[in-house]
């Protein structure tokens, strides 16, 4: 995240770090699954991916879970970057504590342009910059779909965009992480023009994939 601030411990108990063995993407948790982006999982094997929960610091080990299965949406298109959603089934139930909690998923698609949303992640703090040790947080705004379509040709209704200003937004390593409105995850970090150069960030719209998520969380 470019332009963010250090997230306090326990404020985002649903956020996890995916590692192989270094941090490569973010995700959010339910009892047995991690929700993330498809592009995070493509080319990875379940044997190399671990899920790290319960800490805002990358160098402080809390709860570590092994991946049992990597599930990529079969309609994921790596050229158009649509249907960019995936799940990791972990090898045992995630144990909930004050610092490890599931994220709520949306029951309706009520989010609209101008709404404030919170993005969290351990992505780079500027283009080609370092990965921060402390989880970063930033408040962004939802952008009108039409405006976003001008900037990102091929945008679909199953995607959602954010923008605030130049110098704020997602960066490499934030992918797969949660975009949250009022405690409900509405987006998954998908792509943007790296990084924070004045163009909207694009997220997978969680509401559009509720059926897929349910079907694949056996």
UniProtKB/Swiss-Prot annotation:
Catalysed reaction equations from the record: Preferential cleavage: Tyr-|-Xaa, Trp-|-Xaa, Phe-|-Xaa, Leu-|-Xaa
Intrachain S-S bonds: 25-40, 148-161, 171-195
Keywords: Disulfide bond, Hydrolase, Protease, Secreted, Serine protease
Cellular location(s): Secreted, Extracellular space
Stored SMART domains: Tryp_SPc
Alphabetized GO MF terms: serine-type endopeptidase activity
Residue ranges annotated for the Peptidase S1 domain, each copy included: 1-218
Additional notes on this entry: An additional Arg at the carboxyl end was found in some of the molecules.
Family designation: Belongs to the peptidase S1 family.
Protein's name in the database: Chymotrypsin-2
Organism: Vespa crabro (European hornet)
